[in-house]
């Protein structure tokens, strides 16, 4: 068995949430763990249970070097083989155990209680509802919905992480139980009576950003029965090795693949008409003669990119994010008196330009003008520049020497964002950019997909603009966040020219925001 070949990126994410982090100690702690996934035929034979197991393995195999895959009856043994293949497609050197004797923690799907002497989390779902219990099996529902099932896997993986690294987490007690509807984000002990098996026409929908959150959304949409319509998937990048840390649909075979092409492949079993656009959003908009965007799912990394999407004036936007302390989803019309997407990301004060931020993260802020020139010209970084970075970072030059002559953005993404300097410094040189854990990005993506489907189906929307979840703490009792419309008058949703343009595109009718109870 061995840690995955992208473990340094996973370690970068962990370093941002764990106290007293040391790379060597972190890897040693992982190598001691055996994480079990146990299941019976009740889970293995239904769509919800299969979805829970699939995503649980996709999440766990990205971090832990040994998994115990444990079918609890003969009828479920066929599923074990598929899960083993899935785990090895992510980390070919992962250790697979067929006994739970050495397991430190276990996720259990189905209706059976395994005879294991370790911390156990029973996970499952019932339609829109995600379920977790510390004491009793929760089973898997009979619907074809993936949302509760996928969210349960994220809650389970988060509790596994909090169990193993409890000593380095503050306030990270374990969840005693969870019963949360992704339809309303209400906690409920009763069966969620919302529609579960129904055809949904997405109309013409855009999914912008096919990174970690986008992968979570694609995973869910690919498992949603009865979807039709046209889905535009927009992202200009290709999958890199470091992306495997949290891209739930990506394995070793997908490295180098266009993210837009991967999205098309993931959705090929659906009835969706998928159009891949391997472009930046601005390039896609410029090439598109029609600037009507009925529904846009936003899974982008930066505030600037989100502002650009809102600037194109889509009719309705669902926006998903991960940040240092939580993840979430926000919902936006424009001419409705509520917060638009720009209201959520309105800059205050003077923001630093990209070249200044990169120069600072390279440890040489005084060279920001040289960094600016290198970015603009796409010129290769000279030898003396790489030497200066190595000196500033306190790491040897030799491992960075292969980057001499490469474009600065490539050097920055691989050496800094990709975790090479982090590894060379034994984790002492932390990456400033927030790198979420895989279970955080996946849940944000599942929530995004759920919002797109609910909106397309005409289901009533949430009474609040946003919903937030912190997976590094027990699930909170108040998840709804009534984000107010920007009151400064600076936002485009207060600009008469933008309002007039929106009304010319879509008429004077506005999107209703509420109906689902937030209580």
Curated annotation (Swiss-Prot):
InterPro entries per the UniProt record, alphabetical: Prok-E2_C, ThiF_NAD_FAD-bd, Ubiquitin-activating_enz
Keywords: Cell membrane, Membrane, Plasmid, Transmembrane, Transmembrane helix
Statement: the UniProt record of this protein carries the keyword Membrane: yes
A Pfam family the protein falls into: ThiF
Membrane-spanning parts: 141-161, 202-222, 385-405, 433-453
GO cellular component, one term: plasma membrane
Keyword Repeat assigned: no
Signal peptide: none
CDD domains per UniProt: E1_enzyme_family
One MF annotation (Gene Ontology) recorded for this entry: ubiquitin-like modifier activating enzyme activity
Protein's membrane topology: Multi-pass membrane protein
Cell compartment(s), UniProt: Cell membrane
Listed name of the protein: Uncharacterized protein y4jF
Species annotation: Sinorhizobium fredii (strain NBRC 101917 / NGR234)
